[in-house]
Amino acid sequence: MERWWFNSMLFKKEFERRCGLNKSMGSLGPIENTSEDPNLKVKNIHSCSNVDYLFGVKDIWNFISNDTFLVSDRNGDSYSIYFDIENHIFEVDNDHSFLSELESSFYSYRNSSYLNNGFRGEDPYYNSYMSYMYDTQYSWNNHINSCIDNYLQSQICIDTSIISGSESNGDSYIYRAICSGQSLNSSENEGSSRRTRTKDSDLTIRESSNDLEVTQKYKHLWVQCENCYGLNYKKFLKSKMNICEQCGYHLKMSSSDRIELLIDPGTWDPMDEDMVSLDPIEFHSEEEPYKDRIDSYQRKTGLTEAVQTGIGQLNGIPVAIGVMDFQFMGGSMGSVVGEKITRLIEHAANQNLPLMIVCASGGARMQEGSLSLMQMAKISSALYDYQLNKKLFYVSILTSPTTGGVTASFGMLGDIIIAEPNAYIAFAGKRVIEQTLNKTVPEGSQAAEYLFQKGLFDLIVPRNLLKSVLSELFKLHAFFPLNQKSSKIK
């Protein structure tokens, strides 16, 4: 059973958004504090830099339940919150014995011979504790809601062995948003106990899977972060550029959302929208024919292929842009994708336009065999003419994931290569390498930050800064907004 404690519980301040859950429970967890108090140098506690321990009572955890939290309202009434993860129990109780034991231990610590021997002095942490316990700013409902919201929002991660009783590499996660508003809003008296089990409520405990999707019931409301497994409200996610609210991780974006992010409103002019694949090698699998898969992804995404190409303006600067979409068959590059990108490059060369390609692909499309592989050479040949003969400017933007034939061709041929933070970029994926070479791929060796240190990229640019960075790069290479050009001619 895991034991948790609010680090900010004993502050006089209200519960802060940063209140973390401490797993190392040898003593009460560390509280961040910028001041240094020589009276707090208590022996036999874990060392930790830049933090001070609240107090060092050796056996204080003997009477605290493994999953119990203590809170109080503005009237001075104290309540304990019990969260039994193994048995899926949530309980709130106002039994004061918990508080009495904690205060008794605190007074015992205060009056101990250790403090009387010169270490008692002024104890700001004790004062903060007493002030907090009897003079908090929150009412009961707001306090509990804030408390549980922060608790479930934090990175609560329980080994699946706790749930299933067996060893597993996966994790189980509690989703705060699923139970908030239903499990917490109680019309019962404050003195009553509230117990909620998964059978009677929407509190959900489930194992993480490779696709990292939330339960079907809430899939239309929430998007799960691939990094911290937190939930992001889908309605607001687009306005936040698909960046996780909890950890700042850059989630996948559709090609349409990227075009909306980079291209000025009303300036997008798509190219070759009616170009579709005709199953050139008549690839048929036992599960689903290739043509049926294409039709299925077309209905699902509203796209005809895994890339959108066209002309638009970026802060008034005319640009040719291609944006790959990982949601369409993993952004795989088939004959249509290769042809659309090649035509875009040729059009940019004829019109003397700067070129941007946003890469998000699993590589060449196996359902088209060697026809998909030859797209690598065809696109590279078009770029050779565009860059070396026409002397024009090409920016490659690598997003997560960019792998296979895209990495081995136009993805790495940019005059400037930009990667998004934490993007997964590789030629062969981790699983392929490990199965082929029978060697373990080091963790993080295919992440953008590691590859940047090895010199593979020029920049790692956060999504919210990308448009302004591109605008400055284009101006640096003598591509200016249309209105600015006309004013210079006059």
Swiss-Prot record:
All copies of domain CoA carboxyltransferase N-terminal, residue ranges: 221-490
Q: Is Metal-binding given among the entry's keywords?
A: yes
The answer, when asked if Thylakoid is one of the entry's keywords, is no
Q: Which PROSITE patterns match?
A: COA_CT_NTER (PS50980)
Zinc fingers, C4-type, are found at 225-247
Question: Which cofactors go with this protein?
Answer: Zn(2+)
Matching Gene3D superfamilies: 2-enoyl-CoA Hydratase, Chain A, domain 1
Q: Which GO terms describe its cellular component?
A: acetyl-CoA carboxylase complex; chloroplast stroma; chromoplast stroma
What is the tissue localization of expression for this protein?
Expressed in leaves, ripening and mature fruit.
Q: Name one GO molecular function term.
A: zinc ion binding
Main subcellular location of this protein, as a coarse class: plastid
Q: Which SUPFAM superfamilies match?
A: ClpP/crotonase
List ligand-binding residues for Zn(2+): 225, 228, 244, 247
Cofactor binding note? Binds 1 zinc ion per subunit.
| Biological process according to GO | fatty acid biosynthetic process; malonyl-CoA biosynthetic process
Assigned EC number = 2.1.3.15
Compartments annotated for it: namely: Plastid, Chloroplast stroma; Plastid, Chromoplast stroma
Question: Which catalytic reaction applies to this protein?
Answer: N(6)-carboxybiotinyl-L-lysyl-[protein] + acetyl-CoA = N(6)-biotinyl-L-lysyl-[protein] + malonyl-CoA
Query: Sorted alphabetically, which HAMAP family does this protein's record hold?
Result: AcetylCoA_CT_beta
Q: Which NCBIfam families match?
A: accD
Q: Which family does it belong to?
A: Belongs to the AccD/PCCB family.
What is the role of the protein in this entry? Component of the acetyl coenzyme A carboxylase (ACC) complex. Biotin carboxylase (BC) catalyzes the carboxylation of biotin on its carrier protein (BCCP) and then the CO(2) group is transferred by the transcarboxylase to acetyl-CoA to form malonyl-CoA. Is up-regulated upon chromoplast differentiation, presumably for fatty acid biosynthesis.
What do we know about how this protein assembles, alone or with others?
A: Acetyl-CoA carboxylase is a heterohexamer composed of biotin carboxyl carrier protein, biotin carboxylase and 2 subunits each of ACCase subunit alpha and ACCase plastid-coded subunit beta (accD).
**Name the record gives this protein:** Acetyl-coenzyme A carboxylase carboxyl transferase subunit beta, chloroplastic
Tell me the lineage of the source organism: Eukaryota, Viridiplantae, Streptophyta, Embryophyta, Tracheophyta
Point out the gene that encodes the protein. accD
